[in-house]
A protein has these predicted regions:
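Immediate flanking context of iron-sulfur cluster ligation sites
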Residues: 170, 175-186
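A charged helix-plus-loop insertion that forms the helical arch/lid used to bind
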Residues: 95-106
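Glycine/small-residue-rich loop that forms an oxyanion/phosphate-binding "nest" at active or ligand-binding sites
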Residues: 126-129, 133
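ATP-binding/phosphotransfer module of carbohydrate and carboxylate kinases, centering on a glycine-rich
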Residues: 1-81, 91-94, 112, 116-122, ...
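Short beta-strand segments
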Residues: 23, 83-87, 149-155, 159-161
Length: 322
């Protein structure tokens, strides 16, 4: 277990309700507690409990344990709601995790189970849409009305804002990772040549290992090898950039965003990602408006901050209801 010290949590959320927040990822999950003046008092990070068909039950049980730990450490805080973000396809209206290729659940009633475990109302959403809301309200996407926030990590997905409103498409919008960009590797969704199977951080490392027989620690290792002239690493990185640029060109043609904000682990490559990606995108586009490509600014805690914001929204909405 790792806990982020409060001095590192520098995004005040403002006055509002005290809440709990949970961000479930494919590798790790985070839990946070926020007080009524918007201070993020604690963030706890633990491995996501992977247990086959029982993974969703294990996740909810772990949420309960983390909540108890946070409340023990901060006994004066009385959360009025919680926010829960999970990966995969979600039905926000009914609180259901419809399908997760990477974690294996199907039609799981996350909101009901989490509310039963925590004893407070729960706002339920998709992990990238939640992180996107944090970037839109508090981060690099804040200056824009029409903007896409894209996360490139274990998978690839996005949050779409049109005229300042998050567009969810019934829980299915923003699945850029499962658009076809090449005749290529099989994806966990069952398709072939999906962007996620070519250009996600996990895919870059996996493709290099398959091409060379050498196990690497991650996409950063592949980028480092490419910078040193490793031909296989260079080819894999170049193909990932080509696929990303093609996918972004489709996004631009369809939505004409003012900006595309990129977060997730791969965004940490910095100029090695953004400069060649911008050149490739510019080469594809013709008459289209060219969006700014920006690095997400909130960092690795964007998801759990987004979950906290959504939990506060839930409290406010219920208070305002007739």
């Amino acid at each position: 277990m790792t806990t982020s010290a409060p001095e590192h949590l520098s995004l005040p959320l403002g006055d509002g309700s005290a809440v709990l927040a949970f961000d479930v990822g494919g590798t790790d999950m985070k839990a946070a507690i926020v007080d009524d003046v918007g201070r993020i008092l604690d963030i706890v990070r633990v491995p996501t409990p992977i247990d086959g068909e029982r993974t969703a039950d294990a996740v909810v049980a772990r949420i309960g344990e983390l909540a108890q730990e946070l409340l023990r450490n901060h006994p004066d805080v009385r959360p009025l709601a919680a926010g829960l973000l999970v990966p995969g396809h979600v039905d926000e209206d009914n609180g259901v995790g419809v399908f997760s290729e990477n974690l294996g659940w199907s039609n799981y009633p996350f909101r009901d189970r989490a509310e039963a475990t925590l004893g407070i109302p729960v706002s339920f959403s998709h992990d990238v849409r939640g992180a996107g809301e944090a970037e839109y309200r508090l981060g690099a996407a804040a200056p824009f009305r029409d903007v896409v926030v894209m996360a490139i990590g274990t998978g690839i997905s996005g949050a779409i804002f049109i005229q300042g409103t998050l567009y969810s498409g019934g829980g299915m919008a923003g699945e850029m990772g499962h658009s076809k960009v090449a005749d290529g590797p099989k994806c966990v969704c069952g398709g072939h040549g999906c962007l996620e199977a070519v250009a996600s951080a996990g895919a870059i490392a996996r493709r290099y290992a398959q091409a060379t027989g050498q196990v690497v620690s991650g996409a950063k290792d592949v980028l480092d090898r490419a910078a040193r002239g490793d031909v296989h690493a260079m080819e894999i990185w170049e193909s990932a950039l080509d696929a990303l640029a093609l996918d972004l060109s489709h996004t631009v043609a369809l939505l004409a965003p003012e900006a595309i904000v990129i977060g997730g682990g791969l965004s940490q490559a910095g100029a090695a990602l953004f400069e060649p990606l911008q050149r490739r995108l510019d080469a594809i586009l013709t008459f289209h408006h060219r969006p700014q490509l920006l690095c997400a600014s909130i960092g690795e805690n964007a998801g759990v901050i987004g979950a906290a914001l959504r939990a506060r929204d839930l409290v406010d909405d219920r208070a305002a209801a007739p």
